[in-house]
Amino acid sequence: MSPAKPEPGRIGPSNVARAFDEHARSYDRLVGANRSYHEHLRMSARRMGLRDRGAGLRLLDLGCGTGASTQALLDAAPEAEIIGVDASSEMLSIARAKTWPPGVSFVHASADDLASAGITGFYDGILAAYLLRNLAEPNAALRAFHALLKPGAPLAVHEYSVADSARSKAIWSAVCWGVIIPMGKLRSGSADLYKYLWRSVLDFDGVEAFTTRMHATGFVDVKVQTFPGWQQHIVHTFLGRRAPEPDTPPLGLNLTKVDPPSD
């Protein structure tokens, strides 16, 4: 399913970038204080199986925000060329102000219109963190990501997915209303973005539905892994790749199917 259009005054796919513009600095401070947020991004980047410290590789970080996922890719592939892309100009401004090696750059673009910003193939890997549930047409986005990849190259979608588990939904709602939403309001003066985060996760695909999307949009070797801690069966790495050319050696993807949650 595609995300519903937002009601007037509510955050949704059509205006989420503007909401992140308004809350960029407080959002960066919040995620900066969350150690597991950064460690889980690093785990997703490592799960892509990028070889040789990324030497000679060209990687995309879609939905890079203020650069946390970019840093995760850089940690996994320090010798790669990495391009971070985000639709929020204020989030990108914060990302650009951080210290990066020469191989890292940033582009202001919407993930559903990458070509107009000069983002064209081919890439050796794509990381898309906390992005797909914010897009109006996730299938179209996945097809575009597939077209940007070299044959055999991986896509890692780092995302919340709770729809398949009543337990996961309950934990997610408890954490949001007990911690995330109050803390977001305290830091920024408004809870709107953090209420949107809560709602958008509940509305997003379950694990089975999203893996079906990936298969339907051309990805092969699709598998899922989750994370330890309270985020288990709440945050996932969805891994897949563009089909390789015949006789191409397989990539070293860390593709392990995750056990389903038990309610």
Predicted ranges, named:
Residues N139-P154:
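A short glycine-rich, Lys/Arg-flanked "PGG" loop and its adjoining helix->strand segment in the class I
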Residues M1-S26:
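N-terminal, positively charged/glycine-rich alpha-helical extensions of SAM-dependent methyltransferases
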Residues D124-P138:
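A short SAM/SAH-binding and catalytic strip from SAM-dependent methyltransferases
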Residues D112-I126:
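A short acidic, Gly/Pro-enriched loop at the edge of an enzyme's catalytic core
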Residues R58-L114:
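Class I SAM-dependent methyltransferase SAM/SAH-binding core
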Residues R35-A55, A72:
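Conserved alpha-helix/loop element of class I SAM-dependent methyltransferases that forms part
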Residues V31, S161-H215, T226:
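C-terminal alpha-helical "lid/dimerization" subdomain adjacent to the S-adenosyl-L-methionine
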